[in-house]
Amino acid sequence: MAKATRIQSLRFCSIDVTERTVWTFAELSDGSATELVEITCGGSTGRVMEHLRTAVQVLMSTSVGSELDVADALGIEIEQLQNDRSLATAVSCLRSGITGLQARQDGIDLISALGGEPKDSVPLYANINRSLLGENRTPRAFALAGEKAADQGFNIIKCAPFDDIDPGNTTKRLLEAAKIGISRVAAVRSAVGPNVEVLVDCHSCFDRDSSLVVAGELANLGIGWFEEPIEPTQDPKGLAYVAGRVSMPVAGGESGYGETFFADLVNRGAIRIVMPDVKYCGGVAEACRIGRSAVQTAGSISIHSPSGPVSQLASACVTAAIPGAMALEHAVDEAPWRSEILEPPERIENGRFWFPKGATAALNMHVMSLHGTAWVS
């Protein structure tokens, strides 16, 4: 059993992936070991770093018994974490970091520390959207991206076809704007064939009425899930209204923090598939609690993981630790050098994530330096 942990140092490293994407990592040390955690949070990543610097100043003089004690040690209330994503990301980082450091103290891998049995691999689904963030978002481009993912061995593919919709529009205008998105999904379905499952992420573009119409169109294409037609952190009641009236399971929750948030969504019928993100939900151990709770209440879990290889490894460990977990998300074709920034390199083959020895990896700073990045405090 690991002793109480005291964080003694913190440093950061970021890498530019595309014009729209930067991955940022934090390294926490207790003086004898280090733990690498991804803190990518879009335009709020700078605030996450500031929150972490402030928090570590406190934790350097305070021993923490477990990751569950972090928020209390910092005097942070759950309401703050549920309403401030950058703060939730910082606290999630600290909680994941302490879980990892204590696993190292105990001489066990992270999967075991999370209550699971070590595995060779876990199944993935391909998120093709990260490779389609530029200007070429024609149905043909979606079809080619889906076909490429299927050729790489993925039998589940997710797309986000509605990203050019303004969610503030009227229902009529939302439905008009959704037509091209539905055409994109149809193109993916046609390209990959009936034996590949297709998932759709709506990125909270719709209102209640437009959600129901779009769901009906997508049902005709045989999609596997309907992800966040409405933002669950903003309108869980509206999402529950939709979920109770569509034929496919509703998934979501990627921005939520804490087991209580997800349990409420499941209990009110807003989602059937919980999608915690280890970067935001409270960390790896909290993600396991969220997933096990969902499975026990006739729901399912699929970890949200559209970012870099550091959070991918952590998310794979969580997936491996939860019996009955669904396939894990993997963003395909965003950067050709993605796997090389870890040592050992990330291994994705035949639609599966293959664990490195000990289910752990470090940043390859030689490769990182080739992209003009280095550690900063």
Set out the residue ranges of the language-model regions.
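Metal- or metallocofactor-binding catalytic centers and their adjacent structured scaffolds
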Residues: 33-108
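Glycine-rich phosphate/pyrophosphate-binding beta-alpha loops
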Residues: 17, 38-46, 127-133
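Conserved, mostly hydrophobic/aromatic
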Residues: 32, 94, 107, 157, ...
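Metal-dependent enolase-superfamily TIM-barrel catalytic cores that perform enediolate-based chemistry
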Residues: 121, 125-239, 245
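Glycine-rich, aromatic-flanked loop segments that form ligand/cofactor-binding clefts
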Residues: 89, 94-135
